């Protein structure tokens, strides 16, 4: 039995993953330090040309990379499809892809890609319109390195120190606060508490240093390229005291489901857990939590989603089934994806016909892409 809808589309359907040429590192939550914009390189004669309002087929630029990957993709066991191209090929693919698949494609400014780096160009390929409440219509526009995404979403591994940060201000005076640390991570082992704010890193004033040298040093320290990098952090804790620690970066095992417990209240037993991300490895933790809730006969449930950034829709369907149960979900639709008016019936990412997603009541073998015969609690 095939589980036909569990792509890595985040819960907000405006999120997109950049898989072409390995993607990049960027986010709607900008890095803690704003860097000087990249100066565009001088185009070479072999580059394709941009023409305002003219969109060539995606296939003309697909997998043409300025720096092609080679060898076998460890997550697909297939050869990388990359061929030699240019930065302009990458940017024009992003442009055409956005025009074909983006929900608000007709609200995207068609700016000359020669004026941007690849990631800088993608960052502005979105609507700038606001909702009636004044918030950005698209609040989930970001790119991510493909290998990093696959490692996190499929294996639950993320590189770094184990911090989950709250980006308060990315310009001076900067504010970067620890929301929580991953259990067993270097950050947790160092005893850095929730609510601590970063004040210095490797001796650099994180809050106020606005020199280019300082900016570069801060970004390099916060986002080390290699595991085993030792970084000196200085934090101001909630009580005003200072905490100085040296932390070594590594491959962090992400725990999506944390702090599952049963609380005795005046209304009876209440189940609680913190749920941070809808990735494949969350399935086991969710099942364990709900097995406990069933055994303890909880009558109320609290799910802490404050730090959840979305993830797989199939997991959201499974979680919803475990909350609502079979009587409320039998033969019901969990969700139906809606794309732009160019794609009313077909998913432009997968090429499959758009069909409603049910409430999945079974454990899913995500590696095989199959529903198993085992029922969820």
Named regions from a protein language model:
Residues 25-32, 40-301, 307-309, 314-315, ...:
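Flexible, low-complexity junctional segments that flank or bridge functional domains
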Residues 13:
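A glycine-rich, hydrophobic loop/mini-helix early in the fold
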């Amino acid at each position: 039995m095939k589980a036909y809808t569990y792509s890595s589309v985040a819960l907000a359907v405006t999120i997109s993953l950049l898989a072409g040429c390995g993607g990049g590192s960027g986010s709607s939550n900008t890095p803690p330090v704003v860097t000087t914009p990249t100066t565009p390189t001088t185009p070479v004669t072999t580059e394709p040309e941009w023409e305002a309002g003219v969109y060539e087929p995606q296939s003309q630029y697909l997998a043409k990379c300025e720096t092609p990957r080679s060898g076998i993709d460890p997550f697909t066991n297939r050869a990388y499809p990359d061929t030699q191209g240019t930065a302009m090929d990458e940017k024009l693919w992003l442009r055409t892809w956005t025009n074909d698949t983006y929900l608000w494609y007709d609200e995207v400014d068609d700016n000359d890609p020669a004026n941007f780096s690849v990631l800088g160009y993608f960052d502005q390929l979105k609507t700038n319109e606001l909702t009636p409440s004044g918030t950005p219509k698209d609040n989930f526009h970001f790119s991510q390195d493909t290998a990093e995404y696959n490692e996190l979403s499929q294996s639950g591994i993320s590189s770094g120190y184990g911090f989950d940060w709250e980006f308060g201000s990315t310009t001076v005076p900067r504010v970067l606060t620890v929301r929580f640390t991953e259990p067993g991570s270097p950050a947790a082992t160092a005893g850095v508490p929730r609510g601590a704010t970063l004040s210095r890193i490797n001796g650099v004033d994180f809050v106020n240093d606005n020199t280019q040298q300082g900016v570069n040093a801060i970004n390099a320290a916060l986002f080390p390229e290699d595991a085993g990098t030792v970084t000196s952090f200085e934090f101001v804790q909630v009580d005003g005291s200072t905490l100085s620690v040296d932390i070594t970066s590594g491959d962090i095992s992400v725990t999506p489901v944390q702090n599952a417990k049963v609380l005795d209240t005046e209304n009876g037993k209440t189940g609680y857990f913190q749920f941070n991300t809808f990735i494949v490895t969350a399935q086991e933790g969710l099942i364990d939590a709900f097995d406990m809730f069933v055994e303890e006969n909880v009558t109320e449930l609290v799910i802490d989603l404050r730090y959840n950034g979305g993830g797989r829709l199939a997991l959201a369907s499974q979680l919803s089934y475990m909350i609502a149960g079979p009587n409320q979900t039998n033969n019901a639709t969990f969700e139906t994806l809606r794309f732009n008016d160019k794609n009313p019936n077909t998913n432009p990412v997968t090429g499959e016909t758009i069909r409603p997603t049910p409430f999945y009541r079974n454990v899913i073998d995500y590696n095989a892409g199959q529903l198993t015969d085992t029922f969820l609690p």
